[in-house]
């Protein structure tokens, strides 16, 4: 099975928020309320506007929320038309509980992205350097942040196919994101990935779930 792919490059949260606003413009424009889970400095709100409510433990959110302790209990069932949670769940021990909460507070759409922790570049790094990246391993001091989960894009796909079926949800869109820089090296890798259609080269998996 080959996944559709997107190749837009972003270096930071601001560029990722712009990618979200552009890629999901139709769904966001149809929504009167948006919840950004893990908003950091509310960058999506700065782009989309006041209909976005940002929550996070750090940064400059509208509400400070510790997802490990409070979950999303301050919000009502179906309170938001569009719920965004990108590059957050892999940091949480209560992964499954938070997904249930994302579904609960959404009235229609839920956008989730997760890293493809087993992309080909990580595998090569482990093979030749013995390192899996900054969010893994055994640092000398207790880290402020780390990934609690290690999964591939196929693991994520199987999980959401099962989850959607069990909860009578629809998968509206999903794609793999290949985030390569615009340097000559990045352009070369991008060209090779496109030519060979390599799913394993993607750095993240994105899925838009719709409630029936």
Predicted regions and their residues:
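A broad, low-specificity signal for short, low-complexity segments enriched in glycine/proline
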Residues: 11-17, 35, 43-46, 71, ...
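Intrinsic structural disorder
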Residues: 1, 31, 37, 181-182, ...
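S-adenosyl-L-methionine-dependent methyltransferase catalytic module, highlighting the catalytic core
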Residues: 6-11, 15, 93-212
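Conserved class I S-adenosyl-L-methionine
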Residues: 1-27
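A near-ubiquitous, low-amplitude feature marking generic local secondary-structure context
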Residues: 3-7, 31, 35, 81-85, ...
